[in-house]
UniProtKB/Swiss-Prot annotation:
GO terms for biological process: translation. It comes from the Bacteria. GO terms for molecular function: rRNA binding; structural constituent of ribosome. It comes from Lactiplantibacillus plantarum (strain ATCC BAA-793 / NCIMB 8826 / WCFS1). InterPro entries: Ribosomal_uS8 (IPR000630), Ribosomal_uS8_CS (IPR047863), Ribosomal_uS8_sf (IPR035987). Part of the 30S ribosomal subunit. Contacts proteins S5 and S12. Keywords: Ribonucleoprotein, Ribosomal protein, RNA-binding, rRNA-binding. Belongs to the universal ribosomal protein uS8 family. This is Small ribosomal subunit protein uS8.
Length: 131
């Protein structure tokens, strides 16, 4: 049994990115779909598609690379873990690399970026940093 599916998802992205794979597939869940959509909207991945397989589904993530095949994602870090949850108040939402990266935060209004959380004045659980 997997104890932290979000960490597994981020690790699969990190590993595929390191060996410059074009895409990767992960078992789907609602929170993974939300995280993948955030990565797409923020320009870290090229595309995300959901494949219905009459079970839990599969998320296919298409990785993005710059010219000369340079990585767009230079780092991914899981912050709030099952053994040590990390919560922030609305006035303490972190900035990643002075705004060059993003923090993915699970709030009462869903999974959003640190910029959206600051704009909506929401706190929540800091899931991961991406830069």
């Amino acid at each position: 049994m997997m104890t932290d599916p979000i960490a597994d998802f981020l690790t699969r992205i990190r590993n595929a990115n390191m060996v410059r794979h074009d895409s990767l597939e992960v078992p789907a869940s609602k929170i993974k779909r939300n995280i993948a959509e955030i990565l797409k909207n923020e320009g870290f991945v090229r595309d995300v598609e959901y494949i219905d397989d009459d079970k839990q589904g599969i998320i296919r993530v298409f990785l993005k690379y710059g010219k000369d095949n340079e990585r767009v994602i230079s780092g991914l870090k899981r912050i709030s873990k099952p053994g040590l949850r990390s919560y922030v108040k609305a006035d303490a939402v972190p900035k990643v690399l002075n705004g060059l990266g993003i923090a993915i935060i699970s709030t009462s209004e869903g999974v959003i970026t640190d910029k959206e959380a600051r704009a909506k004045k929401l706190g929540g659980e800091v899931l991961a940093y991406v830069w």
